[in-house]
Amino acid sequence: MGSSEKNLVELKSFEIDSLNFEYRDSKINFLNSCLTNDQNYLKDVYDALVLGTKDYVEKNNFKGVLIGSSGGIDSALTAAIAFDALGKGRVKTIMMPFDFTADISIEDAGSLAKNLGIEHSEISIKEMYESFSLALKESFEGMGIDKTEENLQSRCRGVTLMALSNKLGFLVLTTGNKSEAAVGYSTLYGDTAGGFSVLKDVSKTLVYELANYRNSLSVVIPKRIIERPPSAELAPDQKDTDSLPDYDRLDPIIEMYVEDDKSIQEIINEGFDEKEVRRIVSLIDFNEYKRRQAPLGIKISDRNFGKDRRYPITNSWKP
Protein backbone atom coordinates (compact mmCIF):
# COMPACT_ATOMS: atom_id res chain seq x y z
CA MET A 1 0.00 0.00 0.00
CA GLY A 2 1.44 3.37 -1.03
CA SER A 3 1.88 6.34 1.28
CA SER A 4 -1.09 8.14 -0.31
CA GLU A 5 -3.41 5.16 0.09
CA LYS A 6 -5.42 4.15 3.13
CA ASN A 7 -7.22 1.03 4.25
CA LEU A 8 -10.96 1.80 4.32
CA VAL A 9 -12.21 -1.43 5.82
CA GLU A 10 -11.17 -5.04 6.37
CA LEU A 11 -13.29 -8.13 5.93
CA LYS A 12 -13.15 -10.92 8.48
CA SER A 13 -10.03 -13.07 8.39
CA PHE A 14 -10.09 -16.86 7.94
CA GLU A 15 -13.83 -17.13 7.34
CA ILE A 16 -16.28 -16.39 4.55
CA ASP A 17 -17.30 -12.74 4.55
CA SER A 18 -18.74 -10.26 2.06
CA LEU A 19 -19.11 -6.53 1.59
CA ASN A 20 -21.55 -4.60 -0.58
CA PHE A 21 -20.70 -1.10 -1.73
CA GLU A 22 -21.57 1.48 -4.37
CA TYR A 23 -19.03 3.45 -6.34
CA ARG A 24 -20.64 6.64 -7.58
CA ASP A 25 -19.25 10.06 -8.40
CA SER A 26 -15.76 8.94 -7.38
CA LYS A 27 -17.02 8.04 -3.91
CA ILE A 28 -17.43 4.68 -2.21
CA ASN A 29 -20.59 4.10 -0.22
CA PHE A 30 -20.53 0.99 1.98
CA LEU A 31 -23.93 -0.67 2.17
CA ASN A 32 -23.29 -3.14 4.98
CA SER A 33 -24.79 -2.00 8.23
CA CYS A 34 -22.15 -3.59 10.47
CA LEU A 35 -18.52 -3.24 9.48
CA THR A 36 -15.67 -3.73 11.91
CA ASN A 37 -12.00 -3.04 11.64
CA ASP A 38 -10.97 -4.84 14.79
CA GLN A 39 -7.51 -6.39 14.77
CA ASN A 40 -6.63 -9.04 17.32
CA TYR A 41 -3.46 -11.04 16.76
CA LEU A 42 -4.45 -13.97 18.97
CA LYS A 43 -7.88 -14.17 17.35
CA ASP A 44 -6.32 -14.16 13.88
CA VAL A 45 -3.83 -16.89 14.79
CA TYR A 46 -6.48 -19.01 16.48
CA ASP A 47 -8.89 -18.61 13.56
CA ALA A 48 -6.10 -19.52 11.13
CA LEU A 49 -5.41 -22.73 13.05
CA VAL A 50 -9.11 -23.60 13.10
CA LEU A 51 -9.51 -22.96 9.37
CA GLY A 52 -6.30 -24.81 8.49
CA THR A 53 -7.42 -27.85 10.47
CA LYS A 54 -10.93 -27.79 9.05
CA ASP A 55 -9.71 -27.47 5.46
CA TYR A 56 -7.16 -30.26 5.74
CA VAL A 57 -9.55 -32.73 7.36
CA GLU A 58 -12.59 -31.99 5.21
CA LYS A 59 -10.89 -31.52 1.83
CA ASN A 60 -8.99 -34.78 2.32
CA ASN A 61 -12.20 -36.59 3.29
CA PHE A 62 -11.28 -37.78 6.77
CA LYS A 63 -14.17 -38.88 8.97
CA GLY A 64 -12.72 -37.10 11.97
CA VAL A 65 -9.61 -36.75 14.10
CA LEU A 66 -7.89 -38.59 16.95
CA ILE A 67 -5.79 -36.80 19.56
CA GLY A 68 -3.57 -38.33 22.21
CA SER A 69 -4.69 -36.37 25.27
CA SER A 70 -1.95 -36.24 27.91
CA GLY A 71 -3.55 -33.80 30.30
CA GLY A 72 -1.04 -31.20 29.09
CA ILE A 73 -1.56 -27.86 27.42
CA ASP A 74 -0.47 -28.79 23.88
CA SER A 75 -2.97 -31.63 23.50
CA ALA A 76 -5.64 -29.54 25.23
CA LEU A 77 -5.24 -26.64 22.80
CA THR A 78 -5.13 -29.05 19.84
CA ALA A 79 -8.39 -30.63 20.99
CA ALA A 80 -10.05 -27.23 21.43
CA ILE A 81 -9.00 -26.16 17.93
CA ALA A 82 -10.21 -29.45 16.45
CA PHE A 83 -13.54 -29.07 18.24
CA ASP A 84 -13.99 -25.54 16.90
CA ALA A 85 -13.02 -26.70 13.41
CA LEU A 86 -15.04 -29.92 13.15
CA GLY A 87 -17.61 -30.10 15.93
CA LYS A 88 -17.79 -32.53 18.82
CA GLY A 89 -18.93 -35.54 16.80
CA ARG A 90 -15.73 -35.71 14.75
CA VAL A 91 -13.13 -35.38 17.52
CA LYS A 92 -11.98 -38.22 19.77
CA THR A 93 -9.35 -37.98 22.49
CA ILE A 94 -7.44 -40.90 23.98
CA MET A 95 -5.55 -40.84 27.28
CA MET A 96 -2.80 -43.48 27.31
CA PRO A 97 -1.47 -43.63 30.87
CA PHE A 98 1.60 -45.41 32.18
CA ASP A 99 3.40 -45.64 35.52
CA PHE A 100 4.60 -42.02 35.36
CA THR A 101 1.26 -40.49 34.40
CA ALA A 102 -0.02 -38.33 37.25
CA ASP A 103 -3.56 -38.85 38.48
CA ILE A 104 -4.30 -35.19 37.84
CA SER A 105 -3.24 -35.64 34.19
CA ILE A 106 -5.87 -38.35 33.79
CA GLU A 107 -8.44 -36.18 35.55
CA ASP A 108 -7.63 -33.09 33.48
CA ALA A 109 -7.78 -34.99 30.17
CA GLY A 110 -11.22 -36.25 31.15
CA SER A 111 -12.37 -32.78 32.24
CA LEU A 112 -11.24 -31.29 28.94
CA ALA A 113 -13.24 -33.84 26.95
CA LYS A 114 -16.28 -33.28 29.16
CA ASN A 115 -16.06 -29.52 28.70
CA LEU A 116 -15.90 -29.94 24.93
CA GLY A 117 -18.53 -32.67 24.85
CA ILE A 118 -16.28 -34.95 22.80
CA GLU A 119 -15.74 -38.72 22.98
CA HIS A 120 -12.89 -39.68 25.29
CA SER A 121 -11.37 -43.05 26.15
CA GLU A 122 -8.51 -44.40 28.22
CA ILE A 123 -6.12 -47.11 26.98
CA SER A 124 -3.21 -48.06 29.22
CA ILE A 125 0.10 -48.72 27.45
CA LYS A 126 1.49 -50.72 30.39
CA GLU A 127 0.84 -54.18 28.93
CA MET A 128 2.16 -53.16 25.53
CA TYR A 129 5.27 -51.59 27.06
CA GLU A 130 5.98 -54.68 29.14
CA SER A 131 5.59 -56.91 26.07
CA PHE A 132 8.09 -54.81 24.12
CA SER A 133 10.47 -54.77 27.10
CA LEU A 134 10.28 -58.55 27.44
CA ALA A 135 10.95 -59.04 23.74
CA LEU A 136 14.00 -56.75 23.97
CA LYS A 137 15.28 -58.04 27.32
CA GLU A 138 17.96 -60.33 25.89
CA SER A 139 19.19 -57.68 23.45
CA PHE A 140 19.42 -55.12 26.26
CA GLU A 141 21.25 -57.48 28.65
CA GLY A 142 23.79 -55.64 30.81
CA MET A 143 22.64 -52.19 29.70
CA GLY A 144 21.19 -49.63 32.08
CA ILE A 145 17.96 -47.65 31.86
CA ASP A 146 18.24 -44.57 29.63
CA LYS A 147 16.23 -42.56 27.08
CA THR A 148 15.43 -45.79 25.23
CA GLU A 149 12.80 -46.72 27.79
CA GLU A 150 11.31 -43.21 27.72
CA ASN A 151 11.05 -43.26 23.94
CA LEU A 152 9.51 -46.73 24.02
CA GLN A 153 6.59 -45.35 26.04
CA SER A 154 6.02 -42.65 23.44
CA ARG A 155 6.20 -45.18 20.62
CA CYS A 156 3.64 -47.41 22.33
CA ARG A 157 1.30 -44.44 22.27
CA GLY A 158 2.08 -43.82 18.61
CA VAL A 159 1.28 -47.44 17.73
CA THR A 160 -2.01 -47.21 19.63
CA LEU A 161 -3.12 -44.02 17.90
CA MET A 162 -2.16 -45.23 14.43
CA ALA A 163 -3.97 -48.55 14.94
CA LEU A 164 -7.12 -46.65 15.91
CA SER A 165 -6.61 -44.34 12.94
CA ASN A 166 -6.48 -47.28 10.52
CA LYS A 167 -9.50 -48.95 12.04
CA LEU A 168 -11.71 -45.86 12.34
CA GLY A 169 -10.59 -43.85 9.33
CA PHE A 170 -9.77 -40.90 11.59
CA LEU A 171 -6.73 -38.66 11.11
CA VAL A 172 -4.25 -38.49 13.99
CA LEU A 173 -3.41 -34.92 14.97
CA THR A 174 0.01 -34.62 16.56
CA THR A 175 0.33 -32.15 19.41
CA GLY A 176 3.96 -30.98 19.30
CA ASN A 177 4.77 -27.28 19.08
CA LYS A 178 7.42 -25.24 17.26
CA SER A 179 9.64 -24.89 20.33
CA GLU A 180 9.86 -28.67 20.76
CA ALA A 181 10.42 -29.19 17.03
CA ALA A 182 13.22 -26.64 17.03
CA VAL A 183 15.31 -28.42 19.67
CA GLY A 184 14.21 -31.99 18.94
CA TYR A 185 12.21 -32.44 22.14
CA SER A 186 10.15 -35.22 20.60
CA THR A 187 10.29 -38.91 19.76
CA LEU A 188 10.37 -40.07 16.15
CA TYR A 189 7.56 -42.58 15.51
CA GLY A 190 6.19 -41.70 18.95
CA ASP A 191 4.60 -38.32 19.62
CA THR A 192 5.48 -37.31 16.06
CA ALA A 193 3.38 -40.18 14.65
CA GLY A 194 0.35 -38.75 12.91
CA GLY A 195 -0.93 -37.08 9.79
CA PHE A 196 -1.25 -33.39 10.63
CA SER A 197 0.39 -31.04 13.12
CA VAL A 198 -1.90 -28.23 14.24
CA LEU A 199 0.72 -26.48 16.40
CA LYS A 200 3.69 -27.08 14.10
CA ASP A 201 4.42 -23.35 13.76
CA VAL A 202 3.24 -22.26 17.23
CA SER A 203 5.83 -21.58 19.94
CA LYS A 204 5.23 -22.84 23.47
CA THR A 205 4.75 -19.33 24.83
CA LEU A 206 2.16 -18.67 22.12
CA VAL A 207 0.45 -21.95 23.03
CA TYR A 208 -0.22 -20.54 26.50
CA GLU A 209 -1.51 -17.27 25.06
CA LEU A 210 -3.84 -19.10 22.68
CA ALA A 211 -5.14 -21.34 25.45
CA ASN A 212 -6.02 -18.30 27.53
CA TYR A 213 -7.59 -16.64 24.49
CA ARG A 214 -9.76 -19.71 23.83
CA ASN A 215 -10.85 -19.77 27.45
CA SER A 216 -11.82 -16.11 27.20
CA LEU A 217 -14.50 -17.17 24.70
CA SER A 218 -15.74 -20.04 26.87
CA VAL A 219 -13.82 -21.99 29.47
CA VAL A 220 -12.99 -25.40 28.02
CA ILE A 221 -9.35 -25.94 29.00
CA PRO A 222 -9.10 -26.71 32.74
CA LYS A 223 -7.22 -24.00 34.63
CA ARG A 224 -4.85 -26.57 36.13
CA ILE A 225 -3.65 -27.60 32.67
CA ILE A 226 -2.56 -24.03 31.97
CA GLU A 227 -0.96 -23.51 35.37
CA ARG A 228 0.95 -26.80 35.74
CA PRO A 229 4.64 -26.96 34.74
CA PRO A 230 4.84 -28.78 31.39
CA SER A 231 6.07 -32.39 31.50
CA ALA A 232 6.36 -35.30 29.08
CA GLU A 233 5.76 -37.66 32.05
CA LEU A 234 8.14 -40.29 30.72
CA ALA A 235 10.14 -40.50 33.96
CA PRO A 236 9.46 -39.86 37.67
CA ASP A 237 8.84 -36.17 38.51
CA GLN A 238 9.96 -35.14 35.02
CA LYS A 239 9.66 -31.51 33.87
CA ASP A 240 10.46 -29.94 30.49
CA THR A 241 12.92 -27.65 32.26
CA ASP A 242 15.01 -30.70 33.22
CA SER A 243 16.19 -30.75 29.60
CA LEU A 244 15.43 -27.26 28.32
CA PRO A 245 15.66 -23.64 29.47
CA ASP A 246 12.45 -21.94 30.54
CA TYR A 247 10.35 -21.24 27.47
CA ASP A 248 10.45 -17.48 28.07
CA ARG A 249 14.20 -17.74 27.37
CA LEU A 250 14.11 -20.54 24.81
CA ASP A 251 11.50 -19.09 22.47
CA PRO A 252 13.18 -15.71 21.87
CA ILE A 253 16.44 -17.50 21.00
CA ILE A 254 14.61 -19.76 18.54
CA GLU A 255 12.78 -16.81 16.98
CA MET A 256 15.95 -14.75 16.53
CA TYR A 257 17.92 -17.65 15.04
CA VAL A 258 15.21 -19.25 12.89
CA GLU A 259 12.94 -16.38 11.87
CA ASP A 260 15.21 -13.33 12.09
CA ASP A 261 18.42 -14.95 10.77
CA LYS A 262 20.47 -13.52 13.63
CA SER A 263 23.92 -14.93 14.29
CA ILE A 264 24.98 -16.48 17.57
CA GLN A 265 26.88 -13.33 18.48
CA GLU A 266 23.91 -11.10 17.65
CA ILE A 267 21.68 -13.19 19.93
CA ILE A 268 24.26 -13.05 22.72
CA ASN A 269 24.39 -9.27 22.28
CA GLU A 270 20.66 -9.19 23.08
CA GLY A 271 21.57 -10.22 26.62
CA PHE A 272 21.39 -14.02 26.45
CA ASP A 273 23.95 -16.34 28.03
CA GLU A 274 26.56 -17.46 25.49
CA LYS A 275 26.67 -21.08 26.65
CA GLU A 276 22.88 -21.34 26.53
CA VAL A 277 22.66 -19.73 23.09
CA ARG A 278 25.30 -22.04 21.62
CA ARG A 279 23.57 -25.09 23.09
CA ILE A 280 20.17 -24.09 21.68
CA VAL A 281 21.58 -23.26 18.24
CA SER A 282 23.41 -26.60 18.21
CA LEU A 283 20.16 -28.43 19.04
CA ILE A 284 18.29 -26.58 16.29
CA ASP A 285 20.91 -27.47 13.68
CA PHE A 286 21.29 -31.07 14.83
CA ASN A 287 17.57 -31.85 14.82
CA GLU A 288 16.89 -30.96 11.21
CA TYR A 289 16.59 -34.71 10.53
CA LYS A 290 13.67 -35.00 12.96
CA ARG A 291 11.85 -32.05 11.44
CA ARG A 292 12.14 -33.54 7.95
CA GLN A 293 10.18 -36.57 9.18
CA ALA A 294 7.54 -34.63 11.07
CA PRO A 295 3.95 -34.27 9.80
CA LEU A 296 3.04 -31.21 7.78
CA GLY A 297 1.08 -28.47 9.50
CA ILE A 298 -0.23 -24.92 9.50
CA LYS A 299 2.04 -21.92 8.88
CA ILE A 300 1.37 -18.84 11.00
CA SER A 301 4.82 -17.22 11.29
CA ASP A 302 7.12 -15.49 8.83
CA ARG A 303 9.25 -18.63 8.66
CA ASN A 304 8.11 -22.11 9.56
CA PHE A 305 9.95 -25.41 9.63
CA GLY A 306 9.29 -27.03 6.28
CA LYS A 307 9.32 -25.21 2.97
CA ASP A 308 10.53 -21.94 4.55
CA ARG A 309 13.63 -23.37 6.23
CA ARG A 310 15.47 -26.42 4.97
CA TYR A 311 19.05 -26.86 6.08
CA PRO A 312 21.42 -29.73 5.15
CA ILE A 313 21.02 -32.73 7.42
CA THR A 314 24.48 -34.20 6.86
CA ASN A 315 27.43 -31.86 7.29
CA SER A 316 30.48 -31.55 9.52
CA TRP A 317 30.26 -27.78 10.00
CA LYS A 318 29.47 -26.54 13.47
CA PRO A 319 28.66 -22.89 14.32
Predicted regions mapped to residue ranges:
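ATP/NTP-dependent adenylation/nucleotidyl-transfer catalytic domains that generate, transfer
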Residues: 2-71, 75-319
